[in-house]
């Protein structure tokens, strides 16, 4: 039986803005960092493909590394060479109002000798902003991913025959309302981890 852990957080944040006015066509540095349309993405900033009201940012990479202790053990260390194949895509809107961004990625880890350690991780997500008025915005994001715990992780059983697989569902939502130099924000977040059962090196199910 898999193990599921959920967490929900709700917070209210009130921020006093500095002196000075901001015109309708200007955004402060803080506003730009918070606004999903202005978030910097160094990995994707180099090339973009325009597609109507969206820009598509594809990414592909190949990496390799040598690990002299792939099981992160204190004795009987095992070495191997690992190849990582990754591909990802991000689609961002170019609208003057509102925003919608989508992303997805896949990473394949291939071990030269210890193929039981091979794993496939992937993720998908969407985030956006609804500009209700000049001073009011809704923001939200939802993400889902399948991943594996690293060997040596404190929560990962050392006797597992394969890396522990888990899925993660996340969601966030917030509402901002500006009152002259005062901004009130209400935000909440949710996360749910689902750890899959594993089998030990002697065939015992690890729950």
Label every model-predicted segment:
Residues 1-35:
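Cleavable N-terminal export/targeting peptides
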Residues 24-207:
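Gram-negative and organellar
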């Amino acid at each position: 039986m898999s193990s599921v852990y959920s967490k929900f957080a709700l917070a209210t944040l009130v921020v006093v803005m500095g002196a000075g006015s901001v015109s309708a066509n200007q955004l402060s540095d803080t506003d730009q960092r918070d606004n999903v349309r202005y978030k910097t993405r160094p990995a994707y900033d180099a090339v973009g493909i325009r597609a109507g009201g969206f820009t598509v940012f594809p990414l592909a990479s190949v990496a390799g590394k040598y690990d002299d202790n792939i099981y992160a053990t204190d004795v009987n260390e095992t070495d191997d060479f690992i190849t990582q194949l990754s591909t990802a895509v991000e689609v961002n809107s170019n609208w003057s109002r509102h925003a919608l961004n989508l992303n997805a990625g896949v990473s394949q880890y291939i071990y030269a000798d210890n193929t039981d350690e091979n794993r496939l991780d992937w993720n998908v997500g969407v985030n956006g902003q609804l500009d209700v008025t000049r001073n009011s915005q809704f923001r939200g994001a939802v993400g889902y991913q399948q991943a594996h715990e690293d060997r040596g992780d404190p929560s990962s059983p050392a006797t597992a025959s394969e890396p522990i697989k888990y899925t993660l569902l996340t969601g966030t939502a917030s509402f901002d309302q500006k009152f002259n130099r005062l901004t009130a924000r209400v935000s909440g977040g949710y996360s749910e981890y689902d750890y899959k059962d594993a089998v030990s090196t002697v065939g015992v199910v690890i729950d």
